[in-house]
């Protein structure tokens, strides 16, 4: 009997930090394939690892989603659910995961062609939701999230084999340049940074609030920032930022009076379904990394 050895294109969580050139396309669809993203915007996405839409959803739609977000984070049953992340210091609900299963309102947003159509075009196939959540960053001291590549975690802990995954962050409040907005290093998606250190069991319980395993070193981040620069994203409610799964990104604290909230949806190609983790002892729970690969229709 022989045991098949699984290829790992992106090694991480070993004894030392290491870089690997990207082995996968950024845009998976054929040139000229139909879809809502213009050719020049696809070129920008391929080059920078992100694209922005100034007004993906209209103000009246924003109001509906904002009301649903407020309903969910105010619901004691949702707050007590393991899918909700409550900040220890403030006791504020910061995130609610698997929101497309909890709420039919957000399930409808996932199915909206303005949303899922862009994912299909970028990934060149049908897609399923690997992860969804609503995020709330209150004013007056809400903590940010340190620099990381989502793919590093999704590969190491969820078993996504290839970089065929795209995220969208849809703003439900205005994103100023002062209230802890999303930052991305343009072009960083072309290099995979494998992080040092083993993955603890049940690492997700800590990492959803403060990333530790899978965190790049200061030296590596400095080199990447010097090479690529840093882009801070601002925009009105209803704007959206699409970004590649391997883009190095993070966000700062929000010490302003102005809260931020968004909907975050991760689409993965049905041809890139999750396997066993590449660098973790156990799978993360399904509400963080889906095992239902049913295409969004």
Swiss-Prot record:
Catalytic activity annotation: L-ectoine + 2-oxoglutarate + O2 = 5-hydroxyectoine + succinate + CO2
Cofactor: record remark: Binds 1 Fe(2+) ion.
Class in the EC hierarchy, top level: oxidoreductase
Any one biological process term the GO annotation gives: ectoine catabolic process
Domain of life according to the entry: Bacteria
Cofactor: Fe(2+)
Chain positions recorded as Fe cation binding sites: 148, 150, 249
Site (Important for ectoine stabilization): 154
GO molecular function: 2-oxoglutarate-dependent dioxygenase activity; iron ion binding
InterPro entries: EctD (IPR012774), Phytyl_CoA_dOase-like (IPR008775)
Amino acids binding 2-oxoglutarate: 137
Keywords: Dioxygenase, Iron, Metal-binding, Oxidoreductase
Keyword presence, Phosphoprotein: no
Entry EC no(s): 1.14.11.55
Binding site for L-ectoine: 131
Biological role stated in the UniProt entry: Involved in the biosynthesis of 5-hydroxyectoine, called compatible solute, which helps organisms to survive extreme osmotic stress by acting as a highly soluble organic osmolyte. Catalyzes the 2-oxoglutarate-dependent selective hydroxylation of L-ectoine to yield (4S,5S)-5-hydroxyectoine.
UniProt family annotation: Belongs to the PhyH family. EctD subfamily.
Subunit structure: Homodimer.
Protein name per the record: Ectoine dioxygenase
Organism of provenance: Streptomyces anulatus
Gene label: ectD
């Amino acid at each position: 009997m022989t045991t098949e050895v699984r290829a790992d294109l992106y090694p991480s969580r070993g004894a030392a930090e290491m870089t690997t050139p990207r082995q996968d396309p950024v845009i998976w669809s054929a040139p000229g394939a139909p879809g809502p993203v213009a050719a020049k915007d696809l070129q920008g996405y391929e080059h920078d690892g992100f694209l922005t839409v100034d007004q993906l959803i209209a103000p009246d739609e924003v109001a509906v989603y904002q009301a649903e977000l407020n309903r969910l984070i105010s619901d004691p049953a949702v707050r007590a659910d393991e899918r909700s992340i409550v900040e220890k210091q403030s006791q504020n609900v910061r995130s609610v995961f698997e929101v497309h299963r909890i709420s039919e309102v957000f399930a409808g947003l996932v199915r909206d062609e303005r949303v899922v159509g862009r994912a299909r075009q970028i990934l060149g196939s049908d897609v399923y939701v690997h992860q969804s959540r609503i995020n709330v960053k209150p004013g007056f001291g809400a903590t940010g999230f340190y620099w990381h590549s989502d793919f590093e975690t999704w590969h190491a802990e969820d078993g996504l084999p290839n970089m065929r995954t795209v995220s969208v962050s849809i703003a439900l409040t205005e994103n100023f340049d002062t209230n802890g907005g999303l930052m991305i290093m343009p072009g960083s998606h072309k290099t995979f940074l494998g992080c040092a250190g083993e993955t603890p069991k049940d690492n997700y319980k800590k990492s959803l609030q403060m990333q530790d395993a899978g965190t790049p070193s200061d030296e590596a981040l400095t080199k990447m920032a010097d090479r690529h620069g840093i882009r801070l994203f601002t925009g009105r409610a209803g704007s959206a930022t699409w970004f590649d799964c391997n883009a190095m990104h993070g966000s700062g604290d929000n010490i302003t009076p102005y809260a931020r909230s968004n909907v975050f949806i991760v689409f993965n190609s049905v041809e890139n379904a999750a396997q066993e983790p590449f660098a973790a002892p156990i799978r993360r729970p399904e509400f963080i990394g889906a095992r239902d690969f049913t295409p969004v229709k």
